[in-house]
């Protein structure tokens, strides 16, 4: 188990990896990073939400990240980032974003697309107490390209 509420399978699951036969297994350092992110961000968030939270993406090996067109600098590849979604839980993505911003330490958090009221999902990363930047961004499309602005 990665944490009380995240199984090893859930932390590495990807339909793309399964479909393409890609090995999406983290090494020990990546797994330690995943456990730290779960401890510092996911579990406190889940306790506040009061129930399950959908994880759209957690760990991505390099092959998987390349297959989905992810950034070469993606913290998902280090086990330091996850994308969470309110699908089925009793809080909105916007509420989860605000809770993380106001109550938790994090490295980077992204309001992923959506509109000004609610993102489609929330990207959040955690590095370490000393290295976290508490950086908040908003992702948007401009002429078909994803861009980010500080919020």
Predicted stretch roles:
Residues 2, 64, 73, 105, ...:
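Glycine-rich, flexible loop/turn motifs
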